[in-house]
């Protein structure tokens, strides 16, 4: 029986060779911007609009998004760009050659959650578009169509991704125009309703102004922290760090607060973050149809990138390394389809809690990776050791797990929950001054540095012995 052939380079989790990393700055920016500009921005804007006015909300959200994106770039960027690996593979030096399963599970849950949300949003918008065009009558029939449209969307994404990273880039080239349509919608509501927009007051604002501002920043941080699962699979295609940094900050980060202003403005003035509802009021039925077409198409770019990143992440599992790309795509898409078919309304209603839970997990993870790469390893990694396991290997630690990373992740998550309950949004007295994500990242970093120093002294984890390094420098001089 013939052995299955090795997967194509961009369909594997192996490090990409320089000749395989062909995405320039323009192509990477376009792909990242299309990925970022999904309709979740409206829901993010709606969440911020519950606590802050338009100007304050825009400033807080933008600041939070850039802070979160910087954490993600510092955490996953160096290893992913240097060696052409994905986000999951980049955690092996911290968690071990078995412990990386923990970040892999976090990646899968996050991407499944986001993609489910976007597919449900697509199905709902497609139903509204059909009603607006007179193709169907409004009523309960729309709810029955949501599962069918979910299956259709998953089939289209599956077909596009049969071509690997090329499929992601192709979808981005087609859908990039929707970013400008989104900016046009923002211009419409701002230009038509500016006096009302400035005078509008948020409905859920707390008496403490500081709490409201901090929550706006926290929502921005949590939003861009959710890019950690995606970023590695995209920037590994770039030839070097100089090519990747600006596209990440301007292409993957900036569109999120900009397009979130659509939802922020809509919920403040017209009590709805969905542009397809308020554009009918602003510009009539024609504008509403244009908006629905935009909303329907916008989510494909993000969902395609998410499915691709998740499928590449699955390649890190030894049992799936030789499986066909088609099999991996099906494994990745099936959970998304099941959520969209069986529990769309329940999942859609829990978006705020899902967004907070992302910050709980990924803020500590970023703190761990930044500390390990810049402080403990001093930017030295062994890429070969990431793909070999067993006793005596550099990243084997103890049984393939690094207890320092697991303890630090637990400490970071506990810090977040102590400061802000992600489900009820009840907070401690320190939260308005600190946020929750930043202390979670800092506490995880501190615990990891202290315990990681002990791991290094024990001679585990492939760290350079600090005393030996000093002797080597002295001998060299």
Question: For the regions a protein language model found, what residue spans apply to each?
Answer:
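Membrane-water interface regions at transmembrane-helix termini and the short interhelical loops
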Residues: 49-51, 78, 94, 102, ...
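Juxtamembrane transmembrane-helix boundary signature
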Residues: 61-95, 104-120, 447-459
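Extracellular loop-to-transmembrane helix junctions
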Residues: 47-77, 99-105, 252-253, 439
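Membrane-interface "cap" regions at the ends of multi-pass membrane proteins
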Residues: 1-58, 187, 207-217, 236-241, ...
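Transmembrane alpha-helical segments of multi-pass small-molecule transport proteins
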Residues: 104, 133-163, 177-187, 212-228, ...
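Hydrophobic alpha-helical segments and their helix-loop junctions in multi-pass secondary transporters
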Residues: 119, 123-127, 132, 178-204, ...
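C-terminal membrane-solvent junction of multi-pass transporters and transport-like membrane proteins
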Residues: 366-447, 463-468
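Hydrophobic, membrane-embedded alpha-helices of multi-pass small-molecule transporters
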Residues: 25-41, 187-194, 203-266, 285-304, ...
